[in-house]
């Protein structure tokens, strides 16, 4: 009897292990990880505790000085859902350096893009933010709109509005980073805009787009879309300058960026090899 029970246990555990290697199993692992982080961060938020990894928000000027930059330099924002992180990069010596990483208290939905109004899904993709997209009087303390839907989203019939980065720890499709963190982010982005940066790029990813992370999720419904995102991610990783992002025939296309193009809006443009232009 004991041998039979042991055999049954081995079969059950083996079957579970095999399931976790499937795309559905990987999705389950990701959902468990996301929900555990959400529960932890929301409990800390309600208790008035800082979230793990929060920068020293009381000494931003000293941190800027230590980084060798001043308030008002151009900025670039990256968001990673799975890791619950928002990064601020600042321009220094002809490229961008990471200045701070802020924990995202809450984002809603699952890994994957936003599809339609009301799906409570946080966007993924390439966006830009100008001064008109900032709201200093938001119900969520301060906020800026990502500009969803962009041209890519529109080409795929995706709908939605008021998709923000904001304070607090509540979300119906936004990225909530707490009031103290959004105050610092606000100072950095408004400082850059006030000093002449026309807009700043915000690139939102499901996770850090490494080869290993993509392999783990091979077979996902979104692996083709994520492969497009990875191309833009890799260009930045190589140069630490945001790439030029365009939309061609419903797909993202990229070109290596320069400091002069780092603030470019996402436009509808096909490269010559696609259009046949000389």
Residue ranges and their predicted role:
Residues 177:
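A conserved hydrophobic position in a structured secondary element of the catalytic/binding core
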